[in-house]
Regions:
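Short helix-capping/linker segments at secondary-structure and domain boundaries
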Residues: 351-369, 406-411
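C-terminal region of N-terminal signal peptides and the immediate post-cleavage residues
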Residues: 16-61
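Gly/Pro-rich cap/lid or specificity-loop segments adjacent to the active site
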Residues: 45-342, 398-400, 404-541
Length: 541
């Protein structure tokens, strides 16, 4: 899935279907087996044994929490440590890697009951998604009013999954080349531009292999799920309480499939579609179509505030204003760094999070009035963040490419996305370029596991979804709900922010608290009215 910067309702405070993949366009994969989805039977048995070995070691060792690395710039109240996991679970005595973990201990005091003491319920482990997002800042969320009751009962635990940050980091290219700007972003690319992007995708895939070697094949979702079980053991938890957002819901669901008896409670916020036939090529086609709908929502909001922004009184007029800015930036980049690709990246964020709407509309309005400063500030590359961003993209690419078969014939990509771009031009081709290295991936592919639990196999789980989420289309929440027996789906109606847990919707948060604090869920499904739309911000006169 195409991933923007981490900004789920939880992560924000802290700071990706038309046709099936043709058989002729996919690489060979190892046969799956009941012993371990995505592997041969013998390897699956070895990986299950290796996970048990690693978890037993972690339980005996624990995590020695202490001061966090200075480079993380975390406050003193957060403590950090590491947990050791095998690079390859089929060989638990082979190469080991360390995952960085952060924690704030439960306060034990309920802020809504006069600081009345409350019992500790263990660790709440969070993953923000991506793949490639860092979870180290998650414990800071306990400072927010919406999270104080949860922070009273739970140790808030974040971590960097394998490949992220200091957790055996991946890299595929020189970070100094990562944030080059300005750059083009054609919505209907020429054949010459397509050939250029194919060449770049091949070079990027080669770079991943050259920089990581044989280790590259071990960065995938099944190993992320196994790592999570080792982390559970290292934290001293018999059963896991987990919240995943976006991609984090996918490997959380893999965990539930592989280790159902190790689950205490699980929250899936903004679920991706776990159907093995959709991981990940068809999921990205669905996502591009959903981005178009959410882009229309944003333009409709801007048009209703034409008196503030002057960008047009209809969505079509707002589109023309956007295209005018894009054409102008192609001819003369703003600040020497912001071209059409940087504009596109900034406005893609508006399809993830409503909070961006006033800022992006104001910046576009200001730019078209001859004042580019806000657009440069919001869309310009931040070179200080290049290394972190390059690392995030490398992990994203490795995990998605390793997880599943992808079409290996460029003609399949070209056919499907040319069709899609006729009706969904906003993000379709940029989504292609983000994922195209998977067509030329040098490492073996997994076969996606059949995420599924039967009645009574898994404790009840909570699924949260916004009805108009573009990054994780709502169909994914319905599919996740169908596959996890006993799960309950809470929908935020007529809303589209990507990730809704712990945000401004009190109805959603009440369901989240009731579940995590009391184990209480609605009988079947529940719906919450959507959050209020953002208020416009008037540009300077």
């Amino acid at each position: 899935m195409r991933a923007a910067a981490l900004h789920t309702a939880a992560g924000a405070l802290l700071l990706s279907t038309l046709t099936a993949v043709p058989a002729a366009g996919t690489p060979a994969v190892s046969p799956a087996s009941p012993a371990s989805p995505g592997t041969s039977a013998a390897t699956g048995i070895a990986e299950r044994h290796g996970t048990a070995v690693a978890a037993a070691r972690a339980a005996a060792t624990g995590i020695g929490f202490g001061a966090c690395p200075d480079a993380e710039d975390l406050p003193a109240g957060i403590r950090c440590g590491t947990v050791t996991v095998p690079l390859d679970y089929a060989h638990p005595d082979g190469r080991q890697i360390e995952l960085t973990v952060s924690r704030v201990e439960a306060t034990g005091k309920d802020p809504r009951a006069g600081e009345r003491p409350v019992p500790r319920q263990g660790a709440l482990v969070f993953n923000p998604g991506g793949p490639g997002g860092s979870g180290l800042y998650f414990p800071l969320i306990g400072l927010l009013p919406e999270w104080k009751r949860l922070g009273a009962a739970y140790d808030l635990v974040g971590y960097d999954a394998r490949g992220v940050g200091r957790s055996a980091p991946l890299s595929c290219e020189d970070p100094g080349h990562f944030f080059k700007g300005p750059a083009p972003a054609p919505t209907h690319p020429s054949e010459a531009y397509k050939r250029e992007r194919v060449a770049r995708a091949k070079a990027y895939a080669r770079g991943c292999a050259e920089r990581s070697g044989d280790a590259l094949r071990h960065y995938h979702s099944l190993n992320n799920a196994r790592d999570l079980d080792v982390l559970r053991a290292a934290l001293g938890e018999d059963r896991l309480t987990f919240m995943g957002a976006s991609y984090g819901t996918y490997f959380g669901a893999l965990y539930a499939t592989l280790f159902p008896s190790h689950v205490r409670r699980m929250v899936f916020d903004a679920p991706v579609d776990p159907d093995p036939e959709h991981i990940w090529y068809r999921d990205n086609l669905s996502q591009s179509a959903a981005f178009e709908a959410r882009w229309a929502d944003f333009r409709d909001w801007v048009a209703r505030h034409d008196d503030v922004y002057g960008l047009g009184a209809t969505p079509d007029e707002v589109q023309r204003s956007y295209e005018r800015a894009r054409d102008r930036l192609a001819a003369e980049p703003a600040g020497g760094t912001v071209g059409p690709a940087q504009l596109q990246g900034a406005f893609l964020q508006a399809t993830y999070y409503d909070d961006y709407w006033p800022h992006r509309a104001e910046a576009l309005s200001e730019y078209l009035r001859g004042r580019p400063e806000q657009l440069v500030a919001q869309a310009g590359p931040v070179r200080e963040a290049a290394a972190e961003a390059e690392n995030g993209r490398a992990v994203y690419t490795a995990v998605e490419c390793n997880d599943a078969p992808w079409p290996t014939d460029w003609r399949v990509w070209d056919r499907d996305n040319t069709r899609l771009a006729r009706v969904a031009p906003f993000e379709t081709w940029d989504n292609v370029w983000a994922n195209l290295p998977c067509a030329y991936w040098p490492a073996p592919r997994q076969r996606p596991a059949d995420v599924r639990t039967g009645p009574g196999e898994l404790p009840p789980t909570l699924i949260l979804a916004a009805e108009r989420d573009a990054a994780a289309p709502y169909q994914g929440a319905l599919e996740m709900h169908r596959r996890l027996a006993g799960s309950v789906l809470v929908t935020e109606r007529d809303a589209g922010t990507h990730g809704i847990a712990g945000g401004p919707n009190r109805c959603v948060d009440d369901h989240l608290e009731a579940y995590l604090l009391e184990g209480r869920l609605p009988v079947r499904r529940a719906a919450c009215a959507g959050r209020a739309e953002p208020e416009p911000r008037a540009p300077a006169k």
